[in-house]
Amino acid sequence: MKIHNIIKIIIVVCLEGFALTSFAGFGDSCASLPTTTDGYLESDTAYGYIIRSIDMKAPGGNCDANKPGITFCFKNKDGSSDPCTMYTLNQGDSKKISDLSKDNNPDLGANPILKNIVLTVQTWQNDICLLMPTSRGPMPVACKALSNPPAPPSVPSCSNIGQSCYTGANYSQSLINFSGLAVQCLKETLDKIFFVGNSCGSQSQSSEITNLTAFPTFQGYLKNAIGAALILYVMFFAFNMVLNKEYGNPDKIALFVIKLLFVTYFSIGLGPLNFNSSQPTQENGMLKYGLPLLTGIAPEFAQIIFNAAGSKGLCVFDTSKYQSGYQFYALWDSIDCRIGYYLGLDLLYNIDKNGVLSSFARGDGGNSSGSIPIPNLGNPDKNSPNALTSVGSLRFFTVMFGFFMAGNVIILISGLVFAVIFLSILLYFITHYLVCMITIYVMTYVSPIFIPMMLFNRTKGYFDGWLKVSLSCALQPAVVAGFIALLITMYDSAIFKNCEFLRYDYEKNNVKFSTFELRLPASSAEVCQESFGYKMLNYYAGKGWEEHLVILFPIKSIAKDVVSILAELLCVLVFSVIFYYFSKSISQFAADLTNGPKMDAVTASPTKIVDLVKQGAAFIKDAAQATQGKPPSSGDMPGDGGSKRSEGQKGDDSFISSGGNSSGDSLSSSGGK
């Protein structure tokens, strides 16, 4: 009897052990899950813990790509009869951890930190996944492949939004690109709004669709009205010619015909023209010649200036590799490229530690012209921080933090001031160009009203004002571009000195981009090696870092070449301060030079961020002095500047309230006599 019981116990233990081993694969997913480069989410957060509490390959699981939904087994608390509970959720379903953990597992459903986390079933690339919110966005904790991956979202055609707003990045050759995308997106959108209209079919002409074509429809009616007015103008001229022989003069008739043809062609048009959306519309001379000319002047002039500026080979793209009609992207790519280059985007430097560039086919690039590559650039020191291994990170701020951890606060402040001023000025140029382009489109849209005004002496002033604003908005971005080109030239000279750059062109699946490798010149290479940009590149590559133990915690910092780095950075900072003050008047200078309106009120101020920082610093300083019982240093002291302003205001009020006793009133009354 005892032997029989022992055998039963052994059989039960074996069966339970087999069951446990069948459920022992927690963390198994039907499809592979994405991993982060530093492994932070998988090892140090609730995300990794939830992954290790889900099993998709347990008995009863479903990894069949043809079956809908996602089936998984959610872990129960230790000692339960079943290691986990099976669930099946369809796409779009959501469940809280507390709802999935029905046995109040103290490690999951009863955990106050985890119980309110919501898991949602959604498509993730080509898989259907159970997604969990994390600090880095929604991330999948379990996935299953789909037999029919979802088709990419189609670009809406029945819309006023330009197609380049969705696909514009494909025309760029810069790894970091947003300027060209913004310009082309706005241009195509303005084309649709003002002139072309949407591409909706006639069967969809509902009230909502009609509202989308309000501007082109109104201009069509406007052209009809202008055409009728021109007919009346011809009739009145004919009456005058019959009644007055002076109007029958051949010179006046010839001048009348020339002016009439000019006004007719540039206001209401003489024939159709296919615009960008391949939809034929009745175009006028302003759309065929005026608008392309006005919007093309600025990028053409700016591109000429930019090609003559900057370091040798840095961010100079091959315009022949752009698609037809998108060569203007070269200007904006050079701006975006410099933002990434100055701020340490590793791939732009042709640093490929993670093998990203190796997956692309490398074509012919620039000419090395005898320049020398930097030796051992791809071998980082063991003390370099993990943040330098992230693909696409802006390593400038990581390096600045390394200087800060070494106690070099001046370098940190100087670097941040340089970055803020540089980005602010470039943002000002981009917004200035966009505002001028919008103004040109508006001026073109109302051109049927103002162009006929040149026919009459009393209204010719309105035409002159319209023409002045149009030409000014076409030329102002070119003036500002000259200022930006000067800024970039000074920065390149101060940061990289005589360093040279070799372009590498990459291509894969119609995606083209270029990188620029910093190289030593064949002569005077030591000048380049002492430059701020060369030393920063070594820090980006993981060289020169040190590790120290501070209060039992290891920190990584930069303590080498501090004096030379500070000297070079202060030189860059001097140029930044000069351009900061010069940028305050660049808008007024451009407006005066082109005899047009000033755009400050509708563009991003190039000094706004720095001014806010200065005001914040002054406020903190005054607050610190107030806590120490000292009077504030600003002009708002009750007994100093504030009282002076009060006295001045009081004097002004007295002058105003003096009424007829004031000298101004006496002068007015005497003038009346």
Swiss-Prot record:
Name of the protein in its database record: Uncharacterized protein RBE_1264
Subcellular location as annotated: Cell membrane
Family statement drawn from the similarity comment of this UniProt entry: Belongs to the TrbL/VirB6 family.
Bias-annotated ranges (Low complexity): 654-673
Gene Ontology annotations for the cellular component aspect, listed alphabetically: plasma membrane
Species in which this protein is naturally found: Rickettsia bellii (strain RML369-C)
Top-rank taxon, per record: Bacteria
Signal peptide range: 1-24
Bilayer disposition of the protein: Multi-pass membrane protein
Transmembrane segments: 224-244, 253-273, 410-430, 436-456, 469-489, 562-582
Xref: Pfam families: TrbL
Keyword line: Cell membrane, Membrane, Signal, Transmembrane, Transmembrane helix
Primary residence: membrane
Regions of compositional bias (Basic and acidic residues) in chain numbering: 642-653
Region spans: Disordered: 624-673
Keyword Nucleus listed: no
Single GO BP term: protein secretion by the type IV secretion system
